[in-house]
Amino acid sequence: GSLTEEGLYTCLVRNPSPMPESASCGLPDESFIRGSVPMTKEEIREISICKLRLQKNSTVYDIGGGTGSVSVEMARLSDEIQVFSIEQKEEAAELIERNREKFLLDNLTVVRGRAPECLTELPPATHAFIGGSGGGLPEILDVLYRINSRMRVVINAVTLETAGRITEILNRYPVEEEEVVQVQVSRAGKAGAYHLMRAE
């Protein structure tokens, strides 16, 4: 018969040379759909996720999801990890959706909304990564503490003012393990016959 006839058909598609699945952690920045939204760079992503010490059954909030690069990396660690990427800007939320689809991640949920208001509608988290707080860091930490007083939280800060504010805010809570780490990353780039280290 022909394929124009009605009936049940079965089709097998084989890829003779599939791309090998990476066994390493860490995706290159170029792997992500970027747009004009700021993105946490590769080396900082890996350190931040390492400091979170996620477990296979973790539930994690990524507050200020941006492009979704951190959310994607966390979700790829295990199918059992549930990641909620929270983003209030529509352009950024759309990028997270596109990156979620690109990497086929069913365990990554994009939450369009502002933290901390939308956090109480989500399943309680065991971990939280704060890449951007929109100026609401004290309120966000208050809600996180109420949701789970033993939640492990990693906060990225670019300015000295934000870093100082974080240590000031943390004094309000009985923090079991407080750690402040300064990370500087430079990448070599060609300038004529020379290579210059450029800050990331």
Q: What annotation goes with each model-predicted range?
A:
Residues 1-36, 183:
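A contiguous loop/helix-start segment that scaffolds small-molecule binding in enzyme catalytic cores
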Residues 39-56:
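Conserved alpha-helix/loop element of class I SAM-dependent methyltransferases that forms part
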Residues 57-66:
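Conserved class I S-adenosyl-L-methionine
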Residues 67-79:
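Conserved SAM-binding loop of SAM-dependent methyltransferases across substrates and taxa
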Residues 76-83, 147-149:
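Conserved S-adenosyl-L-methionine
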Residues 86-125:
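S-adenosyl-L-methionine
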Residues 87-92, 132-133, 158:
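Short beta->alpha hinge that forms the Motif I/post-I loop of the SAM-binding pocket
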Residues 143-199:
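C-terminal substrate-binding/active-site "lid" region of AdoMet-derived donor-dependent transferases
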